Amino acid sequence: MAFLADALSRVKPSATIAVSQKARELKAKGRDVIGLGAGEPDFDTPDNIKKAAIDAIDRGETKYTPVSGIPELREAIAKKFKRENNLDYTAAQTIVGTGGKQILFNAFMATLNPGDEVVIPAPYWVSYPEMVALCGGTPVFVPTRQENNFKLKAEDLDRAITPKTKWFVFNSPSNPSGAAYSHEELKALTDVLMKHPHVWVLTDDMYEHLTYGDFRFATPVEVEPGLYERTLTMNGVSKAYAMTGWRIGYAAGPLHLIKAMDMIQGQQTSGAASIAQWAAVEALNGPQDFIGRNKEIFQGRRDLVVSMLNQAKGISCPTPEGAFYVYPSCAGLIGKTAPSGKVIETDEDFVSELLETEGVAVVHGSAFGLGPNFRISYATSEALLEEACRRIQRFCAACR
């Protein structure tokens, strides 16, 4: 009898975590490595949020909390959805988890049965299909195209839906591509979803506040209120407020789904860390100027990286609307010989050779379900980004 569960055979380790770990190992050995694999802001958590956590400690807010979150945070979440997304939820329709990942996992665990399908546009965040598989479902991938800026077309979504489809997973702005959908682009997708009343929508809005220029963020149920009773809208404080380590995600949706997720979480982790929840209350209710300042910084970094990558031989990099990633194509390098003498046959070969030759760590696109591409996180200083892009240019020029 095997000791480990059969379910593990359906799951792969996280490629993004693996890249960051590899970069750390090389740095520990003395290598000059620039790591561009991390999916977190390089800013510190704002002082007012840290102070709220310290105040909570001083007040003795160190006990177990209700499974779905402290009332103050659930009220703040409901107000946030009304204020920023024009969505009406009661506090009872919200839930707080230990990061957005737990929210998503609990939603799948609460709803998926063997044979249920989950439609996921590619490229996708690496954890979506793995969570679906762990929960007994079947991921169904729908490739997007670079010429469409990696945005799903309505007709492709329509073709992917079957009687077995239970969820459509929607992420805008996207990890890994940075693609963000306009109101009009979203309306085309929601029109399709209205034709299929058995399909639920799981929307990952974690990068909501990281859009650039005049782009206006919208979320599916805001665009099509008819989806309200079958949409779970997930968000969190990690990206917008530089709070990745605090591990607070949240969602709002139909009460019966929230109750089911609460039941699972109650037998899993119970409530998220009390101090982190009080910090999240301040993040949502307190001053929001931190977000605007950081958007300007990220936009400058994005423009720098896109410009420099498009000067590299064999690289094509579209300009994303949001998040802090770019997703360039390395198709022009496939079939070329790297400085080491190895022929680059895949995007995985490209990123491996780039790391060994130039010490730049990025994530191969095949990990996100669409290649030959690679993901760069520009959540680091302009000086490091400029140096990394120079190294990429040098590597590409040396390929023959």
Swiss-Prot record:
Transport is among the record's keywords: no
Keyword Ribosomal protein among record annotations: no
Species of origin: Rhizobium meliloti (strain 1021) (Ensifer meliloti)
EC number: 2.6.1.1, 2.6.1.79
Sorted UniProt keywords: Aminotransferase, Cytoplasm, Pyridoxal phosphate, Transferase
Cofactor(s) this protein cannot do without: pyridoxal 5'-phosphate
Record note on quaternary structure: Homodimer.
Modified residues (N6-(pyridoxal phosphate)lysine): K239
Listed InterPro entries: Aminotransferase_I/II_large, AspAT/PAT-like, NHTrfase_class1_PyrdxlP-BS, PyrdxlP-dep_Trfase, PyrdxlP-dep_Trfase_major, PyrdxlP-dep_Trfase_small
Physiological role: Catalyzes the reversible conversion of aspartate and 2-oxoglutarate to glutamate and oxaloacetate. Can also transaminate prephenate in the presence of glutamate. Required for symbiotic nitrogen fixation.
Positions of disulphide bridges: none
Any one annotated GO CC term: cytoplasm
Family stated for the protein in its record: Belongs to the class-I pyridoxal-phosphate-dependent aminotransferase family.
Protein name, per record: Aspartate/prephenate aminotransferase
Signal peptide limits: none
Location(s), subcellular: Cytoplasm
One Pfam family, short name: Aminotran_1_2
